[in-house]
C-alpha cells in the first residue's frame, strides 16, 4: 500500500513508476551486501527515501541542464530525480559523486539497468574540477557549513542547492552563516514535520 500511495502522490507515468519500483528492488537486493540504507528503514523505503528524494524536484523553478548529487551513496536523491527527469526533462544530465567504490559500483549498475542519463564519479568531491551545476543536492552527507564549502566551487552562477535537513537545521544554518553569505529558503518536508529542505543560492564565502 505504501508503494501505491507514494506513486499516486508523485503522479508519474507508468514507465517512471516501473523504473522507481525497479530501483527500489535493486536497493533492497544490494543492501544485503553493501550498507546502502539503514536496515530499520527498509520497510519504509517508499516514504523515507523515495518520496523524500522525489520532493526535491517540486522546488525547481526551471529544468536543470546539469544536476550534481554529492555523496550519492544509495542513489537517494540522485537516482530518483534522474528517473523522474527522464519523462519531465530528458535533456537534463546528472552527475553522481560517490567516493566509496562499492556504492559507486551499485550506482553504475542502477544507471545502466534503468537507462539513465547519468554519470557516476568514484572520487572525492574535493578532487573534482568545477562542474558548473544548475542544481546541487546532498542528503545526509555533512553539516551545512561543510556542504557549503563542498558545493560552492561547483555551482553555476544562477544555480541552486537543495539540501534536506533534520531537526537540527536551525543550529546548522547559524553555523553556516558565520562563514558563508547566501540567499536561503527554508521549505517544509513532505515526509517529516521536523525536517526541512534548504534551498540556497548566491553562495559566497565571507
From Swiss-Prot:
One of its GO terms (cellular component) is cytosol. It is an enzyme of class 2 (transferase). One of its GO terms (molecular function) is rRNA (guanine-N7-)-methyltransferase activity. InterPro entries: rRNA_ssu_MeTfrase_G, SAM-dependent_MTases_sf. Its EC number is 2.1.1.170. Keywords: Cytoplasm, Methyltransferase, rRNA processing, S-adenosyl-L-methionine, Transferase. SUPFAM superfamilies: S-adenosyl-L-methionine-dependent methyltransferases. Belongs to the methyltransferase superfamily. RNA methyltransferase RsmG family. Specifically methylates the N7 position of guanine in position 527 of 16S rRNA. This is Ribosomal RNA small subunit methyltransferase G.
Amino acid at each position: 500500500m505504501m508503494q501505491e500511495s507514494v506513486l499516486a502522490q508523485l503522479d508519474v507515468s507508468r514507465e517512471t513508476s516501473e523504473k522507481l519500483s525497479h530501483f527500489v528492488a535493486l536497493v533492497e537486493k544490494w543492501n544485503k551486501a553493501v550498507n546502502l540504507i539503514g536496515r530499520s528503514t527498509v520497510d519504509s523505503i517508499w516514504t523515507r527515501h523515495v518520496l523524500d528524494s522525489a520532493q526535491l524536484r517540486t522546488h525547481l523553478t526551471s529544468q536543470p541542464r546539469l544536476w550534481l548529487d554529492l555523496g550519492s551513496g544509495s542513489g537517494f536523491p540522485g537516482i530518483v530525480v534522474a528517473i523522474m527527469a527522464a519523462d519531465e526533462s530528458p535533456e537534463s544530465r546528472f552527475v553522481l559523486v560517490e567516493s566509496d567504490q562499492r556504492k559507486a559500483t551499485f550506482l553504475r549498475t542502477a544507471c545502466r539497468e534503468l537507462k539513465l542519463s547519468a554519470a557516476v564519479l568514484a572520487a572525492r568531491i574535493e578532487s573534482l574540477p568545477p562542474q558548473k551545476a544548475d542544481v546541487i543536492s546532498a542528503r545526509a552527507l555533512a553539516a551545512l557549513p561543510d556542504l557549503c564549502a563542498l558545493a560552492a566551487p561547483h555551482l553555476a552562477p544562477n544555480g541552486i542547492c537543495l539540501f534536506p535537513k533534520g531537526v537540527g537545521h536551525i543550529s546548522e544554518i547559524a553555523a553556516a552563516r558565520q562563514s558563508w553569505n547566501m540567499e536561503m529558503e527554508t521549505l517544509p518536508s513532505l515526509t517529516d514535520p521536523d525536517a526541512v529542505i534548504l534551498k540556497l543560492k548566491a553562495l559566497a564565502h565571507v
